[in-house]
Amino acid sequence: MPNLWQALVLLPAAAVALCAVTAAAQNATETSDPSRVNRTTFKTTDVAGVKIFYREAGDPSKPTVVLLHGFPTSSWQFHDLIPLLVDRFHIVAPDFPGMGHSEAPSPTVLRPTFDDVGAVIDAFIAQRTMGPVILYLHDIGGPIGMRVAMAHPDRIAGLIFQNFTISVDGWNPDRLKVYEGLGGPETPEKLAETEQFATIERDTLLHKKGARLPDALNPDNWAMDAYAFSIEANRAFMSRLFMNIATNIPHYPEWVAYLKERQPRTLVVWGRNDPLIWPAGAEAVKQAVPTAEVHYFDSSHYALDENADAIADAIIKTFSPRPGMRN
């Protein structure tokens, strides 16, 4: 699908306006009852023939934060964070194709690549939000979100980096070698190697390794991901997307250049004990955006597991509306 970005990202202005009007009408209906505004709702929408599940909460007239999850999890990753932000922000959190409750499309509908998944999420954001958005970028949500930011820099009100690197220095070198080895044409051997990463055992390890109190973590955090693993189509899509991770590396210089040129409002919240993505990734963001606030936590790859309150406080401090400004 070589023209997917043209079809989804470069939407005609009239189509974007129509989406905004439709969303405004729906939001007006949904927020007319004050008791509903701060309640998380669960919805599914069609984006280019792919059913995308998402969580939504808060008043759409407030600044919008789009939460982009990691691998191999889903928007469930943010279930503790959303209630802490809902008084100040409008929250939208999609499940990526083939993950969580979203549909796992066949390769004839959507290729399991970061370019194509990024195009779908870009179109989803255009469809379900109005005005500039703040992007929360975790793990594979980072390269997906940066594609959105690069395509539409004027739609970005801010960026939140959480264990997502824009530099090879941010990778554990051993893991980087794995990703680079999986690149190129798909082979049965590569696919077999990749499938070992889309497992509940690996997911549990990422939650626990480096956590302050690993035995006190909520086991629902990885049990929810086990649901997606149990569906063959989801596991196949995730495995092939994992093989595509190395394609993000050539984009690092342009992402750094974007940050240096645009200087967006930026917050970095980082689990310093992450065995995959190291604190050098946070330092690379700070070098590109010197005004970025950086917070390290004695925690794992999934820093929200133990630090949702502190991360919510940092988001509120950095991105709460200023007088006379929506974002």
Which role fits each region the language model picked out?
Residues G70-T73, D139:
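Active-site glycine-rich loops that stabilize anionic/oxyanionic intermediates
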